[in-house]
Amino acid sequence: MQQSFSRRTLLRGAAASALALPLSGLASRRASALGRMEPIVSPYGKIAPVKDMTTGLPLLQLPEGFTYQSFGWTGDLMADGSPTPAAHDGMAVVRSRYVNGAPEITLIRNHENGIDTRLGLIKGAAVYDGAEAIVFEDQDENEATGPLSGGNTALIFADGKFTEARPVLAGTVWNCAGGPMPWGTWLSCEEGKYDFTDAGGKPHGYVFEVSPNAGETSAVPIKAMGRFDHEAVAMDPFTGALFLTEDDRNQAGLYKFIPADTSKKLGALEQGGTLWMAKVAGEDKVDLLTPSMGDSYQLEWVQIDDPDLPPQPFTEAPFEADN
């Protein structure tokens, strides 16, 4: 069954029912873990503090014989001389290759920053929203003034060693999670659906495709993927469909995006597509905040006619979790 609604109508009618739970496997694992009270013995032996090979600090506890090294600390200078941004969040290795006979991998990392004069705009990257004088007041009346400090950096490792970091995306807000694409890029998701147009900025709450190659990131939002508090995204390698999660407390949903351009290459997702939202089949307003172990639900997908519709307030209170 496939119906057609605006995202506003769907959220008002289905609210948290869209957060369908195909997670019974996880629930079963948790139930199994609760029934097993004896701790599992590690095959690697006991753990103890081990010093970081980069800083000399005992940051982790590991079994004997294990080593590690940290990299890309906040404030460390990147290849262009600018400081590494703060608030490291979602990341993934998007490319693995050989360069001059040696293995090289590239990791792209989110920086979940909002508006911050101290941090400033990430320099040297492709910029989506470069407004410098945005004033923002949150629901607790905390005020922030300055440029948008979210974005992405790319980190290069050659022959097992960290070699450099460089800025790749700037002018975004609250880049929380995202997901790697099979063709070697990263989708960076904004977890903030703000509109700074009145301050000379732009609307936010989008997904951006980030390339590991210098100069290839377009900083163009993929508006067809919807404007909401994005969390993560993953692609089904068999069908090419992308599945997106939302982090909006008790008002979140599960989405499916079918790209119009199926060439699976950099920039293809920017050509648009169709966005769908999940709901429990045949039912409205199903409270899924407090499921029982083993619960499962049959889903149906409802098409979102206008994925870029400005966020609308709920006309009814969202479900509240039991305390």
Annotate each predicted stretch with a short phrase.
Residues Q2, G13, S17-N323:
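Conserved small-residue
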